[in-house]
Amino acid sequence: REKDMNKLLEMILEEAKRITNCDGRTLYMMTDDRRLKFEIMRTDSLNYYMGGTSGEEIPFYPVKLYLDDGKPNYHMIAAYAGLTGETVNIPDAYKAEGFDFSGTKMFDEKTGYRSTSFLTVPLKNHMDEIIGVIQLLNAQDSTTGKVIPFQKEKQVHVESLCSQAAIAITNKKLIDDLKVLFE
């Protein structure tokens, strides 16, 4: 069952990549205690693939939606999308204001990568529940390979994919729960 879910999540991420021609992508799922757990991380140019069917554990703690003082964690881009249900499109993380990109910058320093454009989209199901977040990184011009901002029309396609994906994930979980019930 878990393998089937991982395959579904990977299909969703790969479709988002196809739509946007992005280099990196992360899928987070909402935990029962309202945190965003890293499920799959991929960055093609770094040959970086963790979670999902890779068998590689993701060594990062889940993203807290709420800080220790109980305030919403609006400074983390994934948490912001998970809390508000809003898509966040950032053309250049190094020039963006209002979000904390210190973790991103640390990753870049360690790997020599340059995280630039971000598209972060909540996974909202048919009951309007946010069940996860997809974060895409570094859209690329299909001709030159140069990193570009995520285009608005591609954002709309990804948002549509995410709402369909959230319904598929919710349905898969319900079916799996029913199977367990009848075993």
Range-by-range predicted roles:
Residues 1-17, 28-31:
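Signal-transducing coiled-coil linker helices
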Residues 21-25, 87:
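Short N-terminal helix-loop-first-beta-strand/juxtamembrane motif that initiates sensory/input modules
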Residues 26-72, 77, 95-96, 134:
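GAF sensory/regulatory domain recognition
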Residues 73-78, 86-87, 91-117, 139-151:
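Signal-transducing coupling segments at domain and membrane junctions
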Residues 83-87, 133, 156-178:
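Signal-transmission/dimerization alpha-helices at domain junctions
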Residues 116-125, 132:
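A short, aliphatic-rich beta-strand micro-motif
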Residues 124-130, 139-142:
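Flexible loop/coil segments at beta-strand boundaries within sensory signal-transduction domains
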Residues 181-182:
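Signal-transducing coiled-coil linker helix
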